[in-house]
Amino acid sequence: MIRQVCPDRVVCPSPERNYARAGVSHPDHRAVGSAALDAVYPDARNPFAFPELRDQEGLAPWKVREVWIAGSPSATHFVDVTATFGRKIAALRAHESQIGHADDLEERIRGWLTRAAALGGLPEGRLAEAFQVLDTQG
């Protein structure tokens, strides 16, 4: 997919356990994070990996500029999401099989995002998502 879409940025969950926020360390989420990082480097940029993609489908190797890792225990970049908080909660609530039982969902998420905003130096009352940003150009 990376060779088809040719993104400059890939956003994925962290493959690492985050002991401060156990919920973001779900095994499925960590597996997706690991697979995404493996796809970005080395596979997508390597002309010798999956040569059939190049030869049969015309998909040239692609070098993703950066990866933003969500839920990382080593977050270094903070994005103000205050204006979209309601949409985030609505999207999470649509995932009923996983979230339907969480009566405290909005409060819990607001707490995480408030702490992230404070860590990122945002003004009081703001909410932020936290990411570890990897430069993948090297």
Q: Model-derived features: where do they sit?
A:
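Metal-dependent de-N-acetylase/amidase catalytic core
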Residues: 1-138
